[in-house]
A protein has these predicted regions:
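Hydrophobic membrane-insertion alpha-helices, especially the h-region
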Residues: 8-24
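Hinge/cleft segment of the Venus flytrap/periplasmic-binding protein
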Residues: 9, 271, 275-319
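Short beta-strand segments enriched in small/hydrophobic residues
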Residues: 25-54, 71, 136, 162-171
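Structural motif
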Residues: 70-93, 194-213, 227-229
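Periplasmic-binding protein-like
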Residues: 92-103, 121-125, 164-167, 193-194, ...
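Flexible loop/hinge segments that line or gate small-molecule binding clefts
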Residues: 107-144, 249-257
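Venus flytrap/periplasmic-binding-protein-like
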Residues: 123, 130, 224-225, 235-264, ...
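Hydrophobic alpha-helical segments within soluble ligand-binding/sensing domains
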Residues: 137-163, 248-252, 268-285
Length: 319
């Protein structure tokens, strides 16, 4: 046998040994199987930057945790006159395995939960309701935000100035709860407060002009659309009225830069969206079966600090 033949024989034997070892240890190279969860995020919030940031956080988590996610906002279906119950049922009929739900009405939320099969886990975002279907509650610390607003108003307030809380009469339970807290906390800080509910946002014109002409007034609103409407009046009419509030949108950012809005509390919607989807997918895959309540904080934003690095992740998470 020549040297060349011996080399070929050795290579053949080596190949046979390697194949035997692979088969005996069941070491077969395959494409990794990935379980994809079919989930829905269904919300009832204005089409502002909070909605966009929440959606972006949810999308990022869906990619990271292999979820096929549908993001639905009730406001997109106003022309079709579709209600929240119908949206949820549509997703269930389409094979949805889990839901992240945000609803402006506690009563409606409870009705929806009653009709969701027990085997479908639900993560509530900024919504209060009790049900065995609810596996996690994700919200923001309302009391902390109310204290922050009272603190900022008190710091800037001149002696004798009072506060007017302004919102639309049909706003969500959550927003009304915020104003309930503020109505309680301002007097504790020695600040007189009154409450005004608008039947239509167009009424902001007369309200702002009246308060500005009267003098001695500061305005706080946790209704972003009311805040935007009042800031627009200040800009168009050239009136000066200290405006404070809660919310985040392109218009609020613009009015902060123009100093028609003094400051706002902005919640970490991106973080809330990411955690909600992360939690839901881990429940579905069996990695996390613990019920959990998570509260996200807010940051104080003014025209001067909104582009600080410490606030970028909350205000502009996908910039």
């Amino acid at each position: 046998m020549t040297v060349k033949q011996k080399i070929f024989l050795f290579v053949d034997i080596l190949i046979l040994v390697v194949l035997f070892l692979i088969s005996s240890t069941d070491y077969i190279w395959k494409e990794r199987k990935v379980d994809v969860s079919n989930i829905s995020v269904i919300v009832d919030i204005p089409q502002d930057s909070i909605n966009l940031n929440l959606q972006e956080g949810a999308k990022k988590a869906a990619q990271a945790y292999h979820a096929d996610m549908h993001f639905l906002n009730l406001h997109d279906y106003e022309a079709q006159q579709v209600d929240m119950q119908t949206l949820v049922q549509r997703e269930l009929d389409a094979g949805c395995e889990g839901i992240v739900l945000q609803c402006g009405s506690g009563r409606v939320t409870e009705e929806i939960l009653e009709n969701i099969p027990v085997g479908v886990p639900v993560v509530l975002w900024d919504t209060e309701a009790e049900s065995p279907r609810v596996k996690a509650n994700v919200s923001f610390d309302r009391e902390a935000i109310a204290r922050l607003l009272v603190e900022k108003v008190a710091e800037a307030r001149d002696k004798g100035q009072s506060v007017t809380l302004v919102s639309h009469k049909d706003r969500s339970d959550q927003m009304q709860n915020m104003h309930d807290l503020l109505e309680e906390m301002f007097p504790q800080a020695g600040i007189m407060v009154r409450r005004v509910e608008l039947a239509d946002y167009a009424e902001a014109n007369a309200l702002v002009n009246g308060l500005a002409a009267q003098g001695g007034n500061m305005v706080v609103s946790c209704d972003p659309q009311a805040l935007e409407a009042m800031a627009a009046v200040c800009e168009n009419e050239g009136c000066t009225l200290p405006l404070y509030g809660m919310g985040w949108s392109g218009m609020i950012r613009e009015q902060l830069e123009k100093e028609n809005i003094t400051g706002v509390a902005v919640i970490d919607a991106y973080g809330a969206g990411y955690f909600s989807v992360q939690k839901l997918t881990m429940i579905l895959t069996g990695e996390d079966q613990n019920e959990e309540e998570r509260k996200f904080q807010a940051v104080w934003v003014t025209g001067e600090n909104m582009y600080d690095r410490s606030r970028e992740a909350i205000l502009f998470p996908f910039a």
